[in-house]
Amino acid sequence: MINYDGKRFRNTERSADGTAPVATYHQAGDLVWAEAAGGDVRRCMLVGVCDPDGTIRMGYTMVLANGETAIGRCVSTPRTLDDGRILLHEEWERYQPRPGSGVSFIEETE
């Protein structure tokens, strides 16, 4: 199992001002949680469980820069890059305020 504790991840897409949210992950056994901020995200909290293959199944709540709140769920599947860092392929579904779904990628950063 991948140990996500202390790892930081940044979205591969940037906002209009060139910034992107950065998340710091924590792990105890199969329990994983993270907090994120940056770009269009004022604050985001994530919590979920990690499967033996490193896949994380989590829920999230966030406050966006415009003051909207959003809640949803995400399944993050890891891939190890050539340089040893982790890339997470995220399939997400947002419930409110504008329901939607999509795919994003976040990569391990220092």
Task: Enumerate the predicted regions with their spans.
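Short, solvent-exposed coil/turn segments at beta-strand boundaries
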Residues: 2-5, 26-32, 50-55, 80-85, ...
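Short, surface-exposed coil-to-beta transition loops
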Residues: 18-22, 41-46, 69-75, 87, ...
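Mid-chain, well-packed structural core segment of small domains
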Residues: 51-87
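C-terminal structural segments of small proteins and small subunits
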Residues: 80-103
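N-terminal first-folded block
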Residues: 7-40
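Short, solvent-exposed aromatic-acidic interface loops
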Residues: 38-42, 62-66, 91-98
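Short hydrophobic/aromatic-rich beta-strand segments that constitute the beta-sheet cores
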Residues: 9-11, 32-35, 56-60, 86-91
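Tryptophan-anchored aromatic micro-motifs
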Residues: 1-19, 87-94, 107-110
